[in-house]
């Protein structure tokens, strides 16, 4: 079994939990609250900006010009390619995407996720650690979306179905490249090192779950603690 497949197998329980959590279940039914979608889009805008920067940090770690070319293309996709998915949710909210993301948010779950990825990029010379931190994002979106296509709960009369349709196909290229890179880099690593990479991958899967849940709770920093009326 290739290394990437071992990672996916280990991540299955987490992805199952994400699928059963409120965000995805309400998206399937098409009854998710506008406030949750707005908070998700605002936090995701901040996340995607940093995710794009991480692609740039990966480029110097690449040995192949083809890999560099693909990463540059992915930067362009991050800037423009997910516009359709964002617009689908913005239309449900009833505001333009540009108007929604004028309000900047940086919730704890997004903060911790981004810092997890940057730590791998800055502290590890081997690109596999950064890739392992980034790879769960497209992989989990694709897995959730593909699973939705055969789920009777997917409400085709609601616009949220289009969001699932988008991610059921649009992540395949980056997933394949991340798989190829990880499998190639894993060949020269020890079992102990590969276990560390697996840990990085699974931590990002947990961060993905917390990110979706963050939208449902409208998560914010509670610097003053919770006030009990």
Curated annotation (Swiss-Prot):
The active site is at residues 137, 208. GO terms for cellular component: cytosol. Coiled coil: none annotated. Signal peptide: none annotated. It is an enzyme of class 3 (hydrolase). InterPro entries: Haem_Oase-like_multi-hlx, Thiaminase-2/PQQC, Thiaminase_II, Thiamine_Salvage_TenA. Its EC number is 3.5.99.2. Substrate binds at residues 44, 141, 167. The record marks 47 as: Increases nucleophilicity of active site Cys. GO terms for biological process: thiamine biosynthetic process; thiamine diphosphate biosynthetic process. Keywords: Hydrolase, Thiamine biosynthesis. SUPFAM superfamilies: Heme oxygenase-like. It catalyses: 4-amino-5-aminomethyl-2-methylpyrimidine + H2O = 4-amino-5-hydroxymethyl-2-methylpyrimidine + NH4(+); thiamine + H2O = 5-(2-hydroxyethyl)-4-methylthiazole + 4-amino-5-hydroxymethyl-2-methylpyrimidine + H(+). Gene3D superfamilies: Heme oxygenase-like. Pathway: Cofactor biosynthesis; thiamine diphosphate biosynthesis. NCBIfam families: salvage_TenA. Belongs to the TenA family. Homotetramer. Catalyzes an amino-pyrimidine hydrolysis reaction at the C5' of the pyrimidine moiety of thiamine compounds, a reaction that is part of a thiamine salvage pathway. Thus, catalyzes the conversion of 4-amino-5-aminomethyl-2-methylpyrimidine to 4-amino-5-hydroxymethyl-2-methylpyrimidine (HMP). Is also able to catalyze the hydrolytic cleavage of thiamine; however, this thiaminase activity may not be physiologically relevant. Therefore, is probably involved in the regeneration of the thiamine pyrimidine from thiamine degraded products present in the environment, rather than in thiamine degradation. This is Aminopyrimidine aminohydrolase. It comes from Staphylococcus aureus (strain MRSA252).
């Amino acid at each position: 079994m290739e290394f990437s497949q071992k990672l996916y197998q280990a991540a299955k329980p987490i992805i199952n939990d994400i699928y059963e959590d409120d965000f995805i279940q309400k998206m399937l039914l098409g009854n998710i609250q506008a406030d949750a979608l707005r908070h998700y889009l605002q936090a995701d805008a901040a996340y995607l900006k940093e995710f794009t920067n991480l692609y740039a940090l990966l480029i110097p770690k690449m040995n192949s010009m083809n890999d560099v070319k693909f990463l540059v293309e992915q930067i362009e996709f991050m800037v423009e390619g997910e516009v359709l998915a964002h617009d689908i949710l913005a239309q449900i909210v009833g505001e333009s995407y540009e108007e929604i993301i004028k309000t900047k948010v940086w919730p704890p779950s997004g903060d911790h996720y981004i810092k997890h990825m940057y730590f791998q990029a800055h502290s590890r010379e081997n690109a596999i650690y950064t890739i392992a931190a980034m790879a769960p994002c497209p992989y989990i979106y694709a897995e959730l979306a593909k699973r939705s296509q055969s789920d009777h709960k997917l409400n085709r009369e609601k616009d949220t179905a289009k969001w699932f349709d988008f991610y059921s196909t649009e992540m395949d290229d980056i997933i394949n490249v991340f798989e190829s890179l990880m499998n190639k880099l894993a060949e020269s690593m020890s079992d102990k090192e590969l276990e560390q990479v697996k840990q990085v991958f699974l931590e990002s899967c947990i961060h993905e779950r917390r990110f979706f849940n963050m939208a449902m709770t409208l998560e914010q920093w509670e610097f003053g603690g919770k006030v009990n009326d």
